[in-house]
């Protein structure tokens, strides 16, 4: 497994880095020790005949991608030499027209000339293995991409820029400092006294525990921001739950009638409220019922209430409260 890991790391990889949909621009990325050899085989400049492997790092070049003598597309090519790239490897980025067929054809040519298809997340994996980012930063890359609101994006960017890493390093540094003091005292008890040190150590440990608990709480809050707050609308039948859902999403998502028990299954929608994502679920009206289908809906509603982050309880003020409330 270790030998396979080393082998995979030295191979040159390639993938389509932009969305696989028709758009103005597409991006194909190549990374590895043979990246410049691969691009030399398939790229010809618009003017001159200088090989890209002879060009400086962080330069952009205009020309065409060829499959032998056939022009595939007109492109811009960005060169990044190791270690000054995302993966800390030689990296080539081909900016082409954004048609899905064009991107696939260019990738096929790249693979035919010495690269292999990248595995999902392999560029970020290499950035981690090569020491460009740590584990928390590697995790935050996908969080940035999948951010559903401004708060999640800000939190992910802070983590990507090393905010979490800095806090962990600070705690680790203090622990190492105390361990070093204890070891020194054990090695040289005549000159280093640990009288009364136990009480001070407990105070230090308590403070570090407080910091770690704050980080854990912050992580849990961050998860809510990233994934969205699961919000369940509950109440008796005909209390106005579906009308509230429609008002929140700004369209008629749920059927609204005067007949009680119209909503049988769970209706889910997602809205952004002042930068916070709410995963809203409209549920069946909660009441005692002999209807088999409606009872399944009521059971689902009660199950969602137990798992909800936030509950909106809807009451019809025109009627008196009863046992179903």
What positions do the PLM features span?
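Long, non-coiled-coil amphipathic alpha-helical linker/lever segments
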Residues: 132-211
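Residue-level signature of catalytic and energy-coupling elements of molecular machines
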Residues: 28, 94, 182, 212, ...
């Amino acid at each position: 497994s270790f030998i396979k890991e080393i082998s995979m790391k030295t191979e040159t990889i390639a993938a389509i880095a932009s969305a696989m949909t028709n758009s103005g621009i597409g991006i194909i990325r190549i990374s590895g020790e043979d990246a410049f050899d691969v691009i030399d085989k398939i790229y010809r400049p618009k003017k001159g005949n200088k090989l890209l492997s002879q060009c400086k790092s962080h330069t952009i070049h205009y020309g065409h991608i060829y499959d032998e003598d056939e022009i595939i597309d007109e492109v811009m090519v960005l060169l990044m030499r190791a270690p000054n790239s995302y993966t800390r490897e030689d990296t080539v980025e081909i900016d082409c027209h954004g048609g899905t067929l064009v991107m696939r054809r260019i990738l096929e040519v790249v693979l035919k000339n010495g690269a292999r298809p990248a595995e999902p997340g392999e560029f970020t994996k290499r950035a981690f293995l090569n020491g460009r980012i740590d584990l928390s930063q590697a995790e935050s890359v996908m969080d940035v991409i999948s951010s559903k609101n401004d708060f999640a994006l800000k939190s992910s960017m802070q983590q990507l820029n090393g905010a979490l890493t800095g806090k962990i390093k600070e705690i680790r540094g203090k622990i190492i400092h105390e361990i070093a003091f204890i070891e020194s005292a054990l090695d040289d008890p005549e000159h280093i006294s640990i009288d009364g040190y136990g009480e001070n150590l407990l105070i230090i440990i308590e403070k570090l525990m407080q910091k770690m608990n704050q980080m854990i709480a912050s992580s849990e809050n961050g998860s809510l921001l990233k994934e969205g707050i699961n919000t369940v609308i509950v109440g008796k039948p005909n209390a106005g739950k579906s009308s509230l859902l429609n008002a929140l999403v700004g369209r008629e998502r749920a059927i609204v009638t005067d007949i009680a028990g119209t909503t049988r299954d769970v209706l889910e929608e997602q809205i952004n409220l002042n930068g916070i994502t709410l995963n809203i679920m409209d549920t069946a009206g909660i009441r005692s019922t002999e209807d088999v289908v409606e009872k399944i809906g009521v059971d689902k509603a009660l199950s969602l209430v137990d798992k909800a982050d936030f509950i909106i309880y809807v009451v019809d003020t025109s009627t008196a409260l009863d046992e179903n409330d």
